Amino acid sequence: MGPLFSSMILLASTSELLAACWRNLVLGVVQGLTEFLPISSTAHLKVVPMLVGWGDPGVSATAVIQLGSILAVIVYFKRDLAEVLKGIALAFKHGQWREPKARLGLAIAIGTMPILLAGMAIKLFWPGYEASSIRSLPSIAVVSIVMALLLALAERIGPRLKQMHLVKGRDGFVVGLAQALALIPGVSRSGSTLTASLFDGWQRQDAARFSFLLGIPAITLAGLVELKDAFAELSLEGVLPLLVGIVSAAFVSWLAIDWLLKYLQRHSTWIFVAYRLLFGVLVLAWWLSDTSN
């Protein structure tokens, strides 16, 4: 009975490990597909697991998996980032803050401040944020619909004249304020920044590129903060599933970034407007049917 009992325990633990890896693989794919498309990764990372019966993975788990997306965007834009760092270094050395790359770096720094301050405020003064009604299904559904309508309006009236080399600190601040709204589940960080950029007159592809670059500091900081808490609770068996989620998120995120930039060269954002409206309506209908039963 001893060896048999040990084998049963080993089999059970292996089964649990594989199940955890599968869950994180799915979460990583969902994260990768939705982080950089303007459709809200937070909303999908809450809805999809609940849809398949896994429950809400929580803020910490999703923030850690987001590190895979950060790895992807850093690799994809490594040349841009190198140029920005070089521009900032030259600006500090020679005072050349009017150079495009230096202005881009300054805009990213300024644009990061609103979400950084808002995130700190939530962490310090809203301990019940993760379980609050703002993360509920009806809230996510309504927010998704509202953001779809705003993106539609921006697509309709935005002049689309600005290009990346014209970016200023003021642009970073405006888009950064929109990025801070992404702390509300369903808003979508890429969606809010893309919408604000289109309202502000950016060309679609440049708006997307700036959105991706602007997200690097914010998502990295959020992931690192939650990573500290996650590691405090992490067991040895939890390392592999976590890595599976991060790697799958990185791979799919890279594909999503590449696809979106190419797509926006020749297409509008109407497909995302339609998707977000449909997503919001379906989630709301699901919640209503669930509460009526």
From Swiss-Prot:
Transmembrane segments: 57-77, 106-126, 134-154, 172-192, 212-232, 239-259, 268-288
UniProt cross-references to Pfam families, sorted A to Z: BacA
Reaction catalyzed: di-trans,octa-cis-undecaprenyl diphosphate + H2O = di-trans,octa-cis-undecaprenyl phosphate + phosphate + H(+)
Domain of life, source organism: Bacteria
E.C. code: 3.6.1.27
UniProtKB keywords: Antibiotic resistance, Cell inner membrane, Cell membrane, Cell shape, Cell wall biogenesis/degradation, Hydrolase, Membrane, Peptidoglycan synthesis, Transmembrane, Transmembrane helix
Single Gene Ontology BP annotation: regulation of cell shape
Family: Belongs to the UppP family.
Other comment: Bacitracin is thought to be involved in the inhibition of peptidoglycan synthesis by sequestering undecaprenyl diphosphate, thereby reducing the pool of lipid carrier available.
Protein name listed in UniProt: Undecaprenyl-diphosphatase
Gene: uppP
